[in-house]
Amino acid sequence: MSGIQWIRILYCYPEEITDELIQVIKEEPKICHYLDLPIQHANDEILKRMGRRTSKQELVDIVTKLRKEIPDICLRTTLITGFPGETEEQHQELVEFVDEMEFDRLGVFTYSPEEDTPAATMPDQIEEEVKLERQAELMELQQEVAFDTAEKMIGREMLVMIEGKIADEPAYVGRTYRDAPKVDG
């Protein structure tokens, strides 16, 4: 791994998080304390209909364990809102989950049917307007979480990987281990 400064783990399904992986992340200095967990939802029924192999409680346990074992870990996730049959109650369960878990980074996609997938023909497709409202609600909540997280970083000294100089400015562009290129902006 000579010449490589940082290794970042992206798109790691929650069920793939083992004690061994946690130890490697914790002990290998080149592996960023950053993990992208595509959880998609937090309601057990929706997770099952999506074909996911974890439950809400397992997700809570994984996030809790990661934060306990690696206190400075940056956790990122992606969610899908408006999956066929998603009720307002199931959506609110997802909102509460996001509020409780306080992910450092979070993206929300609205469900869109893909040809030849089981979900494309499921009953109770959600109206586009409802999907967009749900997405906006989750992103507004995440903005609050992101603001709180950023406030906690004030005064911290962090290693920054410089990516380039800003043209015609006496400044540079860089990122910390908490910022994945092309994912976190």
What residue ranges belong to the model's regions?
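Conserved non-cysteine loop/helix-boundary elements of the Radical SAM core domain that shape
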Residues: 1-104, 113-130
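Residue-identity detector for glycine
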Residues: 3, 51, 82-85, 107, ...
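Intrinsically disordered, low-complexity segments enriched in small/polar residues
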Residues: 11, 107-109, 170
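Glycine-rich phosphate-binding active-site loops on the catalytic face of alpha/beta enzymes
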Residues: 107-112, 178
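AMP-binding (ANL) adenylation modules
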Residues: 110-115, 150-151
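Terminal RNA-binding accessory module
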Residues: 121-185
